[in-house]
């Protein structure tokens, strides 16, 4: 078989397969062009889920008549001129493929007029032939009419889903773009019916209203605002408190320099930040905006531009984990901001404190101090209020300014102990335990290189490992919190992480899991009856404990019942 050059029509249709997957792909590419053209208002009209017609009109800069023909050709763009421009790209589009790819699989008409121009011009691509531009009445901006998508590629058209399904994909695309371009007005019509109208949002409240309309009221009610900058990176946006989770990762929006991305490194970093507070099988919700010097991120990874590649992935990962963990730590029980560290005005009588994490010492205990006279203080000074009684040695009943608070004693004490153990571990360090029989491991060349490069890391993680020949290592000591069983697999998994990602969190996760187990077993168990003073001390500890609203397994530690809620239940005032 001889090698032959593909004709332009075939080449364009193959290229279109990478850019135009479905009607939503067309909408994404065309709206991004409108945004790059500084449009303040973008209207999208859809017929039959986009298979029949997609019409996008904007009030942007418009296209010069002499550029109309070039606009429909492949690799023609106004965004970049040379390869070096990719190092500082700030526009959403830059590849010069969108219009050519769309016109290769549809009947496309483009009409545009620049500011101060006497008239607009229209150009069409019919049967793969670009027609000569002709004058046409048109307001400032550009209108692109795409009809009969995939009419010339029946196999692609067969794979389209129902109009309702395709329209939902289009809607999600517009919502994603609306979440990163608040000053732009967006209108979406389907079958001549208005579905979405996002007005320009120039204030914080306006932006929050747009987020609420997309992610929902419940998200905004539980959202924590975040703004964190460090070493040239900035993270802004909103993250949901750990108590608000989803069964699916459907409310996760991450933007890099204003561009929506799906990035495994970012997703894993954010999940790691929620690790201590996320219930098994649940997913966090967030809308976050990462700002980074364009020179440190490559967006030219895939034609859809959903994937990015960072020059220093570890730098970005560590920053994201630290930023989100810091924000989550501010969500103390009953409040949406950090409490003062001092609670001297109450002087709790019971100290819930762990014993040092060193070898040979036992579990945690309640250390009873000399009781102080209990006096009722003003309720609103403490978000969790003041203890009233205990129910069956399980739940603490408390009264605060809003009404009744019910606290799960075991879950609350478990979180308090866990956070104190983690803090003490960071201060005292890991205790190590010698293996009765050292473990010999044979490593491949990549694993040997990873081990030699990261010897200091293994030492910090609590391992004593030595070289044992050119391709072997011997493990002599390990963190005492980890059981010797499966240590070989753990070390190999860590080396695999270091080879693939140049970082690992496996050992830290195992150690935290061990601490969580210790805290769970050491915490007060039902039925256990406390005095009022002991209940008060537990409430005060909860208020100053990070993630005090959730136990180590992600379950809630307390529940608020407002007076109004109780009045409604008992039909008071009706």
UniProtKB/Swiss-Prot annotation:
UniProt-listed Pfam families: DNA_mis_repair, HATPase_c_3, MutL_C
PROSITE patterns: DNA_MISMATCH_REPAIR_1
Disulfide links within the chain: none
SMART domains cross-referenced by the UniProt entry: DNA_mis_repair (SM01340), MutL_C (SM00853)
Alphabetic keyword roster: DNA damage, DNA repair
InterPro entries associated with the record: DNA_mismatch_repair_CS (IPR014762), DNA_mismatch_repair_MutL (IPR020667), DNA_mismatch_S5_2-like (IPR013507), HATPase_C_sf (IPR036890), MutL/Mlh/PMS (IPR002099), MutL/Mlh/Pms-like (IPR038973), MutL_C (IPR014790), MutL_C_dimsub (IPR042120)
Domain of life according to the entry: Bacteria
GO terms of biological process kind: mismatch repair
One GO cellular component term noted in the UniProt record for this chain: mismatch repair complex
GO molecular function: ATP binding; ATP hydrolysis activity; ATP-dependent DNA damage sensor activity; mismatched DNA binding
Recorded family membership: Belongs to the DNA mismatch repair MutL/HexB family.
PANTHER family (alphabetical): DNA MISMATCH REPAIR PROTEIN MLH, PMS, MUTL, DNA MISMATCH REPAIR PROTEIN MLH1
Function: This protein is involved in the repair of mismatches in DNA. It is required for dam-dependent methyl-directed DNA mismatch repair. May act as a 'molecular matchmaker', a protein that promotes the formation of a stable complex between two or more DNA-binding proteins in an ATP-dependent manner without itself being part of a final effector complex.
NCBIfam families tied to this protein: mutl (TIGR00585)
Official protein name in the record: DNA mismatch repair protein MutL
Organism field: Coxiella burnetii (strain Dugway 5J108-111)
Gene expressing this chain: mutL
